[in-house]
């Protein structure tokens, strides 16, 4: 399974989770959008469709494409969000990384990819990715109840319903 990350060079390279996982051989880091795999699930915080277990086959066959950029600079108009299909957003989760600890929905690239893998039922791979960070296992523990609920949903609509119940929407 491919996990390909377009790196926008907007972060502190010493703290960058995707670069660390690239060095470990877990992520392929690319500098051109043309290098993203066709048909991959594209993590897009602006997508109206949430990641769900129904995306498992797509992830296994085509992989995951993510954008590593500053949350302060990410825009709906970003080229990556215009060039591909299969866009998915993540449902409500809380960050455990030191930069954004406790902030809802402001996940690192590693957290976002691990959450995607967990939700589609690839929990062992999600745990492996998080094991490269001291705080990584805590991300899974902190969000375990939600991740388990999302991973039992049938589809994106059910994931959104679970999220609404949790946050009171």
Curated annotation (Swiss-Prot):
It comes from the Archaea. S-adenosyl-L-methionine binds at residues 17, 67, 90, 109. Its EC number is 2.5.1.157. It catalyses: an N(1)-methylpseudouridine in rRNA + S-adenosyl-L-methionine = N(1)-methyl-N(3)-[(3S)-3-amino-3-carboxypropyl]pseudouridine in rRNA + S-methyl-5'-thioadenosine + H(+). GO terms for molecular function: 18S rRNA aminocarboxypropyltransferase activity; S-adenosyl-L-methionine binding. Signal peptide: none annotated. The keyword DNA repair does not apply. It is found in: Cytoplasm. GO terms for biological process: enzyme-directed rRNA pseudouridine synthesis. Its main location: cytoplasm. Pfam families: Ribo_biogen_C (PF04034). It is an enzyme of class 2 (transferase). Disulfide bonds: none annotated. Keywords: Cytoplasm, Ribosome biogenesis, rRNA processing, S-adenosyl-L-methionine, Transferase. One of its GO terms (cellular component) is cytoplasm. Belongs to the TDD superfamily. TSR3 family. NCBIfam families: PRK02287.1. Aminocarboxypropyltransferase that catalyzes the aminocarboxypropyl transfer on pseudouridine corresponding to position 914 in M.jannaschii 16S rRNA. It constitutes the last step in biosynthesis of the hypermodified N1-methyl-N3-(3-amino-3-carboxypropyl) pseudouridine (m1acp3-Psi). This is 16S rRNA aminocarboxypropyltransferase. It comes from Methanothermobacter thermautotrophicus (strain ATCC 29096 / DSM 1053 / JCM 10044 / NBRC 100330 / Delta H).
């Amino acid at each position: 399974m491919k996990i390909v990350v377009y790196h926008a060079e907007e972060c502190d390279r010493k703290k960058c989770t995707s670069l660390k996982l690239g060095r470990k051989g877990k992520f392929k880091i690319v500098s051109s959008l043309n290098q993203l795999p066709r048909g991959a699930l594209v993590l897009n915080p602006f997508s109206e469709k949430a990641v769900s277990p129904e995306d498992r086959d797509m992830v296994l066959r085509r992989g995951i494409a993510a954008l590593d950029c500053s949350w302060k600079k990410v825009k709906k108009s970003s080229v990556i969000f215009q060039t591909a299909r299969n866009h998915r957003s993540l449902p409500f989760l809380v960050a455990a990384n030191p930069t954004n600890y406790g902030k809802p929905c402001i996940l690192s690239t590693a957290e976002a990819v691990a959450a995607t893998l967990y939700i589609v039922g690839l929990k062992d791979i999600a745990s492996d990715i998080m094991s490269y960070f001291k705080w990584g296992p805590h991300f899974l523990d902190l969000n375990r109840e939600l991740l388990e609920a999302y991973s039992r949903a049938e589809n994106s609509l059910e994931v959104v319903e679970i999220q609404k119940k949790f946050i009171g929407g």
